[in-house]
Amino acid sequence: HTFGIDGVTTNPRHIMVSGKPFLTVISEMADWVKAEGIEGYEKFPISVEINPHLDDADEMVAEARKISAICSNFVIKIPCTEAGIQAARRLEAEGIRTNVTLVFSPAQAILPAKNNSLFVSPFIGWKEANGEDCKAYIQAISDIYDNYGYKGKTQIICAAIRTPKQIVD
């Protein structure tokens, strides 16, 4: 892929700032992957976040189904909340891939892996801003995945990256 990029993720706030309607933006993304011939999340995953104001698993699942029907590249980004974990479990059982985000501790990263989520997105910029060791945080999640057989099943995508050093580490 261009520049070695293996996938992308969306952010509702950034889409809102673009001034374009949400469905327009993700439809343009779907058109782009078709034009590039990289259809399918296996080739080029695009994490698309559901409405961040939803707090009901049924509503999350309903919105996720609509979004995933637009493009086979879309992986549904869901918050690591009680309702979000319930929704992710149901979606994965239906074959709709998920990326569980807003993960702030290694313990939170366990349930997405148990539910077979494709990705988990632990926030690191926030952790470092609060004086925590990001490298140790991600290593702890990786160690948990190694210990419980989740490594390779649920991939870790660091989120809220604020500095180049966080990428290198």
Describe each model-derived feature in a short phrase.
Residues 7, 12-15, 102, 118-131, ...:
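Glycine-rich phosphate-binding active-site loops on the catalytic face of alpha/beta enzymes
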